[in-house]
Regions:
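Extreme N-terminal starter segment of soluble prokaryotic enzymes
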Residues: 2-5
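Glycine-rich Rossmann-fold phosphate-binding loop(s) that bind the pyrophosphate
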Residues: 10-11
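N-terminal Rossmann-fold NAD(P) dinucleotide-binding loop
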Residues: 14-15
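Conserved S-adenosyl-L-methionine
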Residues: 23-28, 133-135
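Conserved N-terminal Rossmann-fold NAD(P) cofactor-binding segment
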Residues: 29, 33-71, 85, 307-315
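Rossmann-like NAD(P)-binding element
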Residues: 52-112
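Rossmann-like NAD(P)(H) cofactor-binding subdomain of soluble oxidoreductases
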Residues: 86-153
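C-terminal substrate-binding/catalytic lobe of Rossmann-fold NAD(P)-dependent dehydrogenases
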Residues: 134-138, 148-315
Length: 315
């Protein structure tokens, strides 16, 4: 099946996403667009020289005209986070970049599904929804899908259990106000606290889980990686690839991605991550999972923090 995917931004994240796409079967055509023509041509040259080891695929360094009629568009453009910066620190600069990109790509690919990866991703998703004219159902922010993966990795390591058996999630902003709704955490249907009791009795683990330390690991991992190597891109690319897989599958999936809220948990007019139904038609809606009173308060606080930043921006 012919499927065109456009990646806007050929920085570390965009180039790695394009490379990951070139290894799979989600796309038959990949267009990579970047303001730095020499950089994008170099990235594409590096990618295409490895495509002889797979079934034929088209990968080009293009412009917005080449992105016409894309099935999926991934936006990664923006200034990258530096060590010690929060994602919110990037807001106005990257908002200005998004305001420039959105009308250009929307004009040539009005029917595409859009995956927003640029940080701060919840704000960038909101801005794209407000300035592009694209229906909200076609717009998905990568949100906390990576945070959820980091959480599951940490729990997998702690309990020596495959990540696919862990059902635990990160909600809220992809950033400092995110939280873990522990009331939802299970391992193969067993509440996490009960599973941990069993693991302690069997000496699989000796230390009890510290919820605050676990949340700190999830929230600070990105910053630690940036401090050590300058940027994060492998796990980000893997998480985006997971989203793309859901968008081309025969059935819908549920993932913690960012999309516009319309009264869920009492939250309006902000993009934030809760369990969201996504599939070939984009966003179908939010799964109305019951949260505790404290968890609902944390979600609303996260939404309010994002709204406060949005109110200060020139959108």
């Amino acid at each position: 099946m012919s499927r065109k995917v456009t990646v806007i931004g050929a920085g570390n994240v965009g180039a790695t996403i394009a490379y990951t796409l070139s290894l799979g079967d989600i796309a038959s055509q990949i267009v990579v667009v970047d303001i730095n023509r020499e950089k994008v041509e170099g990235e594409v040259m590096d990618i295409v020289q490895g495509t002889s080891f797979r079934e034929p695929i088209s990968v080009i360094a293009g412009d917005y005209a080449d992105a016409a009629d894309s099935d999926i568009v991934i936006i990664t453009s923006g200034i990258g986070r530096k060590a010690g910066q929060s994602r919110i620190d990037l807001a106005q600069t990257n908002v200005n970049i998004m305001k420039d990109i959105a009308p250009k790509i929307a004009a040539v690919a009005p029917n595409a599904l859009y995956v927003i990866v640029s940080n701060p991703v919840d704000i960038m998703t909101y801005v794209f929804a407000r300035v592009s004219g694209i229906p909200e159902s076609q717009i998905i922010g990568s949100g906390t899908i990576l945070d959820t993966a980091r959480l599951r990795y940490d729990l997998s390591h702690r309990y020596h259990i495959a990540q696919k058996n862990i059902h635990a999630y990160v909600y809220g902003e992809h950033g400092d106000t995110s939280f873990i709704p522990w009331s939802l955490a299970q391992i193969s249907g067993c509440p996490l606290s009960e599973y941990e009791d069993m693991m302690v009795k069997r000496n699989v683990t000796k230390d009890r889980l510290d919820p605050e330390q676990t949340l700190k690991y999830v929230q600070k991992s990105g910053g630690e990686i940036i401090a050590k190597k300058g940027a994060t891109f492998y796990a980000v690319s893997a998480s985006v690839n997971k989203i793309l897989g859901a968008l081309v599958a025969a059935y819908d999936s549920v993932a913690t991605v960012s999309s516009m809220m319309h009264g869920e948990y009492g939250i309006e007019d902000v993009c934030i991550s809760t369990m969201t139904i996504i599939g070939p038609n984009g966003v179908k809606g939010k799964v109305p999972v019951e949260l505790t009173y404290d968890e609902q308060a944390k979600l609303r606080a996260s939404a309010d923090a994002l709204k406060e930043v949005i109110a200060s921006l020139d959108i």
